[in-house]
């Protein structure tokens, strides 16, 4: 269930298998709960098939860490709101990666869900909007 919420259910089975093997090798959730979020993110990024967006989704949904996911939907929304014109995940993450630390885990998950729902409902890949309330 946690892998599905993190968005990994669509990934190749080898990436999921690698993640589970790594999780077992490092001692599981209890051991990982004792290390900082940035260190855990670095370790996740070292795994085959885990990029920045997937690492942050895992942090948010699998490891229960309050992080901001700077995905394409977030970049489009922030651009439209005038909060920055970010071309890449890493550019936006450098600016907004830690803004949610003062919020609860549930609030961080809800923010990500709302941004994704907005993007699915109103966003177009060309940077235009459908019938969006932001116009």
Predicted segments, located by residue:
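Catalytic cores of DNA base-excision repair glycosylases
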Residues: 1-135
């Amino acid at each position: 269930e946690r892998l599905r919420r993190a968005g990994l259910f669509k990934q190749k089975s080898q990436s999921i298998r690698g993640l589970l093997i790594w999780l077992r090798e490092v001692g599981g959730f209890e051991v990982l709960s004792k290390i900082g979020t940035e260190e855990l993110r670095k370790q996740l990024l070292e795994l085959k098939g885990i990029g920045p967006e997937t690492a942050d989704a895992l942090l948010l949904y699998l490891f229960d860490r309050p992080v901001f996911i700077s995905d394409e939907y977030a970049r489009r929304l922030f651009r439209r709101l005038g909060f920055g014109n970010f071309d890449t995940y890493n550019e936006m993450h450098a600016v907004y990666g830690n803004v949610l630390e003062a919020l609860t885990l549930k609030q961080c998950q809800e923010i990500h869900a709302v941004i994704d729902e907005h993007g699915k409902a109103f966003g177009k890949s060309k940077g235009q909007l459908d019938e969006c309330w932001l116009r």
